């Protein structure tokens, strides 16, 4: 197994500037992640702050990790986090089925690698932690995976209907989940790893009650060796710990709205699209009412629960936080703030989309006397199966070409090199010759009568259609004669740029696990891939 890094000049969007020209956007951030010494600066900044809830948080983590099997490394990290100088490296994601797209696992790898790296650099304890966005209520974003049917990736949906309930409380429908898993494993090619994976998933499905629990159990099986900690952002006991900061968010809602709008405007002025694009009345909090998570708006001194008649004054909402903190949750603006208040966060690992909206939050953080958390781009990767790697070696081609979506060009160039039939040129010449010969004939028909003029046009279209038909049949025959070679290109595109998209956004982790083994992520971690922002290619 080996890996290579692609040229960062291939990056696009705001991520390209953040990686390749960080000075161009440094005013949007509090720390420069590519300069030496930022880790020490951040550590010293955090040392000046008090995390009085640290021990309560650690007790909660102990309680939530105690039921897990193979939990020893997790408990060691929780014990480490109890130390007053301990820091965390954080990433987060929704509770996707089968762990969701591969980039979720790459985020987990990132926090594990960086925690070890920074611990050595600072000579102080640093722990990897993964937020599970348990409060998320968009079920359609998490209840599907892609599976391979022929040479096409198809969606497989879990039969469960969204009802506005959060992922951490939405009960998994066991009968539908069993059907889903049976179809999923039937779609996977049988390997020496399949039965082990099936047993692992079946056990997790039998144990888990909710989407969040199922996600956590599977992720733990993949990363228990490294002691990766998990924190459900919708845990009711966590809400009680977070109560003081929810109050701050409510008290400062007016300024919060202004700072968020100003930060977004500054980002857009730099030529980038608005990453959040919300209305000015958005209070950047959610409130659960009648089992549904609903947005809170704030206008003219009052909070309004969207799509209901319910409203609160500030004092009434503060009292509600005191009585029922579990009814409140954050959005994309306030979740980073809550994380900064709750955790001694040395660094946050972000994907390209997260990086863009975090880049709008410096003013929002300053409102609470915080510096914007240091942001490190997550690992981004494509894995190359052995069979595809063999095809690439045979043709002396680079995986990068396919990863960048240029495989079709390679395929057509190869086909053109395999024959000397000038089909397109001859077809064009025939069409032009027929057009030249047919024109006076059509004109004569038109002179005779309008009816014959129309008939002449139809006759021309029919003849030209026959030329096009023969051309298409000739090209199809040539492709069929070279189908074995063409299928190798199709296979490479299917795996390296599925559905014309990055592999890490389409394929779920269990496709890689079934291909390379249940311990593949641990083996990749042993290779210590770098966090430079470059896209990595893993040959497994």
Curated annotation (Swiss-Prot):
InterPro entries with a match to the protein in the record:
Bacillithiol_biosynth_BshC (IPR011199), CC_BshC (IPR055399), Rossmann-like_BshC (IPR055398)
The molecular function terms in GO held by this entry are: ligase activity
Transmembrane regions = none
Q: What is its EC number?
A: 6.-.-.-
The UniProt keyword set, sorted, is:
Coiled coil, Ligase
Coiled-coil regions, chain positions = 457-477
Matching entries from HAMAP family are given as: BshC
Indicate the family of this protein. Answer: Belongs to the BshC family.
Q: What does this protein do?
A: Involved in bacillithiol (BSH) biosynthesis. May catalyze the last step of the pathway, the addition of cysteine to glucosamine malate (GlcN-Mal) to generate BSH.
Would you tell me the protein name for this molecule? Answer: Putative cysteine ligase BshC
């Amino acid at each position: 197994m080996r890996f290579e890094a692609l040229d960062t000049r291939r990056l696009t969007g705001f991520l390209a500037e953040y990686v390749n020209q960080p000075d161009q956007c440094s005013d949007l951030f509090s720390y420069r992640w590519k300069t030496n010494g930022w880790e020490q600066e951040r550590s010293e900044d955090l040392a000046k702050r008090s995390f009085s809830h640290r021990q309560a948080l650690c007790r909660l983590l102990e309680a939530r990790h105690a039921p897990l099997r193979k939990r020893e490394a997790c408990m060691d990290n929780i014990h480490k986090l109890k130390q007053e100088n301990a820091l965390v490296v954080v990433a987060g994601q929704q509770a996707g089925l089968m762990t969701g797209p591969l980039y979720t696992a790459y985020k987990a790898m990132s926090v594990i690698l960086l925690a070890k790296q920074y611990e050595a650099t600072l000579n102080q304890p640093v722990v990897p932690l993964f937020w599970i966005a348990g409060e998320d209520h968009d079920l359609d974003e998490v209840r599907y995976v892609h599976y391979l049917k022929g040479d096409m990736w198809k969606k497989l949906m879990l039969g469960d209907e969204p009802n506005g309930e959060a992922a951490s409380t939405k009960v998994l429908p066991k009968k539908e989940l069993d059907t889903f898993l049976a179809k999923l494993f039937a779609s996977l090619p049988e390997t020496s790893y399949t039965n082990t994976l099936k047993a692992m998933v079946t056990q997790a499905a039998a144990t888990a009650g909710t989407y969040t629990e199922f996600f956590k159990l599977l992720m733990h099986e993949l990363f228990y060796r490294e002691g990766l900690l998990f924190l459900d952002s919708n845990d009711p006991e966590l809400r009680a710990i977070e109560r003081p900061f929810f109050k701050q968010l409510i008290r400062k809602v007016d300024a919060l709205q202004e700072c968020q709008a100003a930060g977004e405007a500054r980002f857009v002025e730099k030529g980038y699209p608005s990453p959040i694009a919300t209305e000015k009345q958005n209070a950047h909090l959610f409130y659960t009412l009648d089992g549904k998570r609903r947005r809170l708006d704030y206008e003219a001194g009052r909070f309004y629960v969207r799509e209901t008649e319910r409203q609160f004054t500030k004092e009434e909402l503060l009292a509600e936080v005191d009585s029922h903190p579990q009814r409140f949750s954050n959005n994309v603006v306030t979740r980073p703030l809550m994380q900064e208040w709750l955790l001694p966060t040395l660094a946050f690992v972000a994907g390209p989309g997260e990086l863009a909206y975090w880049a709008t939050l410096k003013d929002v953080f300053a409102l609470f006397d915080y510096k914007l958390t240091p942001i490190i781009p997550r690992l981004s990767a494509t894995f190359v199966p052995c069979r595809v790697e063999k095809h690439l070696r045979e043709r002396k081609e680079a995986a990068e070409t396919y990863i960048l979506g240029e495989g079709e060009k390679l395929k057509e160039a190869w086909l053109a090199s395999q024959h000397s039939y000038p089909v397109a040129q001859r077809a064009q010449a025939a069409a032009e010759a027929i057009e030249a010969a047919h024109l006076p004939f059509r004109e004569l028909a038109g002179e005779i009568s309008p009816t014959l003029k129309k008939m002449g046009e139809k006759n021309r279209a029919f003849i030209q259609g026959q030329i096009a038909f023969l051309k298409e049949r000739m090209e199809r025959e040539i492709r069929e004669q070279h189908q074995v070679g063409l299928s190798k290109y199709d296979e490479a595109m299917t795996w390296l740029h599925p559905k014309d998209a990055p592999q890490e956004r389409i394929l779920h982790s269990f496709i890689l696990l079934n291909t390379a083994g249940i311990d593949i992520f641990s083996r990749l971690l042993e290779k210590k891939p770098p966090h430079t922002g470059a896209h990595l290619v893993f040959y497994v």
